């Protein structure tokens, strides 16, 4: 139970059912100053019920409430200020973390419901840029968070592996490419060929016709075209996997656009049967006027299907395959109209499960306030940024701890973790500025700061040779530990809040606040002093290390034990 639940129950016991537990909890406030207690209840809402002044109601309630869980209850005007019993609360919180370990904060809320998460989704034959970072790490973190509250996440990398660009690539490869060059540097070479095609096509527009012809062959199942396409795809995936393994992101499915080639006819047939298709300048559309949306373009005048047709097929496939409780699409803000159309068309088809589909949009990464897309005219490659971050982290670790045994491994965990953490600590919908030197700093609100705090806690536990005992009573009642205990207590509701809002930043901010509170505690309290409270203090350190590690895991970061 958190402090608000404890207070709500105490009030509910004396309020004769006038308000439900939930209603009371909604009214409770966190006082701005510690002088006003840990939880405050404003009695205004009871004035009408009791036909008395709020001040009088507050005073009468204070007399009736069972004070077992409180050090004191103060009446200040119309407010009841509750000061929690630090010993009782700290014993309960530390005891629960010691007992549950990394399962602290787990719940069965999700009831094992499947949740496909459409995330990352780069285009084949193009490099993974910093622009792909957000979808990848936000999706991965949401998956961990949902798993913690009892859902079964399914990470789907909906690859951009189909389209007219493959006709261009085949032409370019046959004219100017070599197998060896593609094998050595798949993405760089395929991108070079793609760029060369566009440069040459300016002088020779007939190349565009050749590309269209090759894409038509590919669509018709031509053996040579199909083998080249498969090869471009598999070589690209090898390159992508290097980056995914750096980020330690694993996917359950790589079903991309091509996977749905044979599944779109059914969608068109369903739309026809429901008489939802209307002709517009030779193209076929679904009118979405009643949803205040532009029409959804299903099929072009040349019979080619469009992106939304593929997404409709994918949505139907995912429902049939996973029977999802919810289905998430972690895709940038600019796609919001597309997803509104997607859900509206499914609704028109009578698929009410479309209500369980959600677009999880996010803002842009910027540099100096401008969209981060190019550096010296080139795409900012994610792999280069991650490698640079690892180097910077390694340099700092060498300065702080040159004798560290597994320096390279820790540098990777800290450097890559720093980039992920910086993304996730920002509210998902906000744009944010990216300056690598600041991201990898060991001070301030950074991933390395939280990781370093965890390593510090582990170092104290090693020095004391401390292992907590779940049968022991670990209680503290000092002011310094209380701030730490309150943040530990808040962790389960933080996880729930992050899950409800699909907002990893809630977890990142909790980790920062807990690290800050613990470092303050470390500075003020002699943890290893031999006295009656030593074991309880060490149990608190253990609880901090456990919860920080879990905070970091939910964000997709490691928690090194030494740094």
Curated annotation (Swiss-Prot):
GO terms for cellular component: cytoplasm. The keyword Transport does not apply. The keyword Transmembrane helix does not apply. Its main location: cytoplasm. InterPro entries: Arg-tRNA-ligase (IPR001278), Arg-tRNA-synth_N (IPR005148), Arg-tRNA-synth_N_sf (IPR036695), ArgRS_core (IPR035684), DALR_anticod-bd (IPR008909), Rossmann-like_a/b/a_fold (IPR014729), tRNAsynth_Ia_anticodon-bd (IPR009080). Keywords: Aminoacyl-tRNA synthetase, ATP-binding, Cytoplasm, Ligase, Nucleotide-binding, Protein biosynthesis. It comes from the Bacteria. GO terms for biological process: arginyl-tRNA aminoacylation. This is Arginine--tRNA ligase.
